[in-house]
Amino acid sequence: MMIRPKMGFIVFGVHKDGLKDPLGVPFINQKIIDESKAAIEAKGVELVENEIVVAYKHEAREALARLKHDDSVDGVILFSGTWVWASEIVAAVRDFERAGKGVIIWTVPGSQGWRLVGTLALGASFKEIGMKYRSVYGSDNDTVEKVACFSRACALRNKLNMTTIGAFGGRGMGLTCGCADPSQFMREFGVDIDSRDSMDILKAAEEVTEEEIQDVKENLIKPYFQEMPPDDGCTERSIRLYLAVKKVIEKEKFDMYVIQSFPGLAEEYAASCFTQSMMLQQGIPTATLCDYNNVLTVFLLSNLTPDPVYYGDFQCIDKEKKVVKVIGDGACAPSLAGPDKARFAHHGLPTEGSAGGLSVEAVLKPGKVVMGRIGRDNGMFEMILHRGQVYTPDPDDLKDQRTESGMWFWPHAFIKMDVDYDYGVQVWDSEYITLAYGDEEMYGTLKEFCYLTDIKLIEM
């Protein structure tokens, strides 16, 4: 699902209302304003325009208060029209920004109109009071994209605010790097963590009807898989588990969830691979092993791509070829498979769930991807961010690559990554790589999100 930001658009400048310079040219160039609005709207940003050019305190107060109290507005683009007395605007912008909405100043080049001078005076005033803002200069596509990325990041931060992570179980498989401080999640992101006992899921699983199971087979399995799964108890329990988790998170109104899976349900009922695969397929952010850092990463990526998100073990590196192998623990949104459709397998590891369960066998389709991971270093949030290219090895090599891990029946992604792998191994924040299909728009938006939320950014 691609998030669509909504930004206020306010032109500022004191030399307004048709005032002309000594050459008889209006200080404020309406053509530049119109072209800039059209350019940013073409990037998918919805604008809420102000009717007048803002120059004075009462105008700024009225314009920004209206945007502040509109919950659908994510931030404001302050478009430089000409020189401005910064003191007339600063207080109203400060009040707006403290409501959790982003502020960016956009200046189009040109000597006529004295636009840059107004921008620098205003931006320096924001610095004086310690206010977070962005300022960009240009009218080219790269600059417009910077404005769009910042706008999307504002929308992403606002969408994350006041969400709830549902938790089923506790730390899975000793994954210390996935644990969370609930107070920190609330303080930094406005996210609540609310736990439920896994018995709620088991009870819901028992109540699933045969009609519901058949509906899943017809509408979720048939369209995405080469063949139907075996008609056995393992398949039935896997489908029941998926439906049960879906019902519980809908009942509790969880925006995303984490599940322990093992030890726990994977020993007593079924592994959660099929459940996780179908949730990711439907764009519901989730993470196994109660990995809170991963579910936060999945949430961010899910809102920036039309495709499902994938995560798996950072399983092997070939430093010479600069490629990596990422193997999911049986879970993968089936629509990511390509060119061949996904298949079914059994989970296959009794030491990670003796009850068994359906897993997804797939090789990920080729394409550009952005990979990220939110984690913590000494309690402080950071995000590792890099780009890659998923590719499909030649048939013989593909068979060997899948076989050598011993888990050929689990999802595989083969990714070209031109990075410093020694540095990566040192700083990586988990066993997982989490990725989404996308390019510069996604990458730039995640960078701006880190800026807005004071997350340390590590680019590889």
Show which residues each predicted segment covers.
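Peripheral docking tails and interdomain loops at the edges
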Residues: 2, 107-149, 153, 280, ...
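Short Gly/Thr/Asp-enriched flexible loops that form oxyanion-binding sites at enzyme active sites
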Residues: 82-99, 266-277, 411-419
